[in-house]
Regions:
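N-terminal Rossmann-like NAD(P)+-binding domain of SDR-like oxidoreductases, especially those catalyzing
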Residues: 1-148, 288
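C-terminal substrate-binding subdomain of Rossmann-fold SDR/epimerase-dehydratase oxidoreductases
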Residues: 28, 171-293
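A structural alpha-helix within SAM-dependent methyltransferase catalytic domains
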Residues: 37-40, 77-81, 130, 167, ...
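Gly/Ser/Thr-rich beta-alpha loop segments that engage phosphate groups in nucleotides
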Residues: 53, 101, 121, 152, ...
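A conserved pocket-lining segment of Rossmann-fold NAD(P)-dependent short-chain dehydrogenase/reductase
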Residues: 58, 109-110, 138-155, 165-189, ...
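Short, solvent-exposed loop/turn segments at secondary-structure boundaries
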Residues: 60-61, 103, 117, 153-158, ...
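Hydrophobic alpha-helix immediately C-terminal to the catalytic Tyr-X-X-X-Lys motif of short-chain
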Residues: 124, 128, 132, 162, ...
């Protein structure tokens, strides 16, 4: 595993405690030529999950976002090209590339029109992966994820998405802040379902050059999500506040994806209901409070 282990973006060796002795951890950036070249040469599959995911952070530090999410990824692809790597590359993109949905559920044919720097950088990097496949034979595909949550996600700041924020505040007995009426709908993906999808993508011979929208058939409003988190935690509360301008400017409204292609091509199905997933998540953090809160 090659990981820069940046703490504020989820890197934490604690997450690997159960895998000691079964994996090699190399602390390096994704565009480190020597490290990536050697790792790629020894790999049949590369799961490319490197990047920063905060939309708000991408607006506050746009150059940083582009450096992490696009420039370094271009360096990674160049390493694969120069090495003539034959590894299958599964890249994790985001639903944010679509911007405001023109129709729901959103399928792969929906126009790409991001509303923040993170969406732009992730969209550009997805296109680079596909381009390097067409021109140089890099066997890349892209899986567009939405609202991933579950054990071992970083909770200590606001850089990993809305669900970690909700979980942290509920477990700390603090109010969960919902902007506006919280009516925007989302589909949330439990981490185990994401892992299964990535493994299926890596095994499929039909995947290189393809993109997949991956979400959950269960749709919940943000307020309903907050209510489920509070109920599972048995603590916390919910307060509604007006939209801050910086958040309102990049909010996309309701979003839920059409995963028909992933189901048809990969044989993937989301198996975890939000109620079950959030209960497992809350229990994990309650049992490991000192490490994550």
């Amino acid at each position: 595993m090659v990981d820069a282990l940046v703490p504020t973006h989820g890197g934490d060796r604690v997450n690997l405690d159960g895998a000691a002795g079964r994996i090699d951890v190399i602390e390096a950036h994704v565009d480190d030529v020597g490290v990536v070249r050697d790792a790629a040469a020894a790999s049949e599959v590369i799961f490319n999950l490197a990047g920063q995911v905060s939309h708000v952070e991408s607006m506050a530090r746009p150059r940083f976002d582009l450096e992490i999410n696009t420039a370094s990824q271009l360096g990674f692809l160049e390493i694969l090209r120069e090495a003539g790597s034959n590894a299958v590359v599964v890249y994790t993109s985001t639903r944010q590339i679509f911007g405001h949905p023109r129709y729901l559920p959103v399928d792969e044919d929906h126009p790409v029109s991001p509303v923040d720097v993170n969406g732009i950088s992730k969209s550009a990097t997805e296109q680079l992966h596909l381009l390097y496949g067409e021109l140089y034979g890099v066997r890349a595909s892209s899986v567009r994820l939405t609202n991933v949550y579950g054990p071992r996600q970083r909770l200590r700041d606001n850089l990993q998405g809305v669900l970690p924020i909700f979980v942290r505040r509920a477990l700390s007995g603090e109010p969960i802040t919902v902007f506006g009426d919280g009516a925007q709908e989302r589909d949330c993906l439990y981490v185990d379902d994401v892992v299964e999808c990535l493994l299926l993508a890596a095994r499929s011979t039909e995947v290189p050059g393809e993109v997949f929208n991956v979400g959950n058939d269960e749709r919940l409003s943000l307020r309903a999500i907050a209510e489920e988190v509070v109920a599972a935690a048995g603590s916390g509360s919910i307060e509604s506040v007006p939209w801050p301008h910086d958040r309102d400017a990049i909010d996309i409204g309701s979003y839920y994806g059409d995963s028909s292609k992933a189901k048809r091509v990969l044989g993937w199905e989301p198996r975890t209901s939000f109620a079950d997933g959030i209960a497992r998540t809350i229990e994990f953090y309650r049992s490991h409070r000192s490490r994550y809160l």
